[in-house]
Amino acid sequence: MIVVTGGAGFIGSNIVKALNQIGYNDVLVVDNLKDGTKYANLVDLNISDYMDKEDFIASIVAGDDFGDIDAVFHEGACSSTTEWDGKYMMDNNYQYSKELLHYCMERTIPFLYASSAATYGGRTEHFIEDRQYEQPLNVYGYSKFLFDQYVRALLPQAESQICGFRYFNVYGPREGHKGGMASVAFHLNNQINAGENPKLFAGSEGFKRDFIYVGDVAAVNLWFWQNNVSGIFNCGTGRAESFQAVSDAVLDYHKKGQLEYIPFPEKLKGRYQAYTQADLTQLRAAGYTQPFKTVAEGVAEYLRWLNHNY
């Protein structure tokens, strides 16, 4: 059996899909379906069981036996960069992750988990997996950073795989439940379908992010598991592309609409990553050689899926 926490969420459900595609259907999905709309991410997937997050944590803390577990993909977390309830964030993203990590280490179960490019904060260069480059801008980024630090301290004595992935700007199928936290491509597509012009924040032509297609993220997770590689790795394309490039890809797909700019929100000033670009040196050195989709390629594939499924 494989456990995928956050398995009904965006990246988690795409990992379940990738597992299904290699013939692996014995998957325990752990999630919180208080937002009932997330069920839609699981409808076309094969899983063997579902468990509520709170029940799962209680079982982990109690040391319950789940039988043979081949791996845990820990994608479950609060991923809102605008959530400022620090206690909630640390309980959800840090304490929970520690409990699960120790459970896996004690049983030599491979543990692969979601970190984030938010650990790098507001820098504009050197997105490198090293302490000197890490300075998160919000409590979400801090919760991920602190767990990475915790993992670093344990890695030298770990007898089983521990692998963290610093996800950059992920977009693609199964993110619709994320609302305001869904990708720019998702929102621009919705605006055009509603008969509106697509809108970006003023200055967006100067904002560049490392946008990575979720199918590529799932592929990275599976490769590292199958190759038993430990460490903390950036998971991006290594290319910074502008929000303008995303809107160009959306407009190109729809063949209609004209880009509009709206004022940049006051509440995001100073707390917004204007530039991200993954340094892939360590990822490539670990042996991962697959190419990553460009924004033009990934957005086109995503919009074909999105406009067929919604």
Swiss-Prot record:
Listed pathway(s): Nucleotide-sugar biosynthesis; ADP-L-glycero-beta-D-manno-heptose biosynthesis; ADP-L-glycero-beta-D-manno-heptose from D-glycero-beta-D-manno-heptose 7-phosphate: step 4/4
Q: Do you know which Pfam families this protein is assigned to?
A: Epimerase
Q: Which residues bind substrate?
A: 169, 180, 187, 201-204, 209, 272
Please verify whether the record's keywords include Zinc.
Answer: no
Please provide the record's keywords in A-Z order: Carbohydrate metabolism, Isomerase, NADP
Cofactor binding remark: Binds 1 NADP(+) per subunit.
Taken from the UniProt record, the cysteine pairs bridged by disulfide bonds within this chain are none
- Residue positions annotated to bind NADP(+) are 10-11, 31-32, 38, 53, 75-79, 92, 144, 170, 178
Tell me, which GO biological process terms does this entry list?
ADP-L-glycero-beta-D-manno-heptose biosynthetic process; carbohydrate metabolic process
| Reaction equations catalysed | ADP-D-glycero-beta-D-manno-heptose = ADP-L-glycero-beta-D-manno-heptose
Could you say which EC number(s) this protein's record lists? 5.1.3.20
Give GO MF terms, alphabetically: ADP-glyceromanno-heptose 6-epimerase activity; NADP binding
Note the coiled coil stretches, chain numbering: none
What does the record give as the active site? 140, 178
List required co-factors. NADP(+)
Explain the purpose of this protein. Answer: Catalyzes the interconversion between ADP-D-glycero-beta-D-manno-heptose and ADP-L-glycero-beta-D-manno-heptose via an epimerization at carbon 6 of the heptose.
Q: How does it assemble?
A: Homopentamer.
Q: What is known of its domains?
A: Contains a large N-terminal NADP-binding domain, and a smaller C-terminal substrate-binding domain.
Q: Which NCBIfam families match?
A: heptose_epim, PRK11150.1
What protein family does this chain belong to?
Belongs to the NAD(P)-dependent epimerase/dehydratase family. HldD subfamily.
Instruction: Kindly provide the name given to this protein in its UniProt entry.
Output: ADP-L-glycero-D-manno-heptose-6-epimerase
Q: Which organism is it from?
A: Sodalis glossinidius (strain morsitans)
Q: Which gene encodes it?
A: hldD
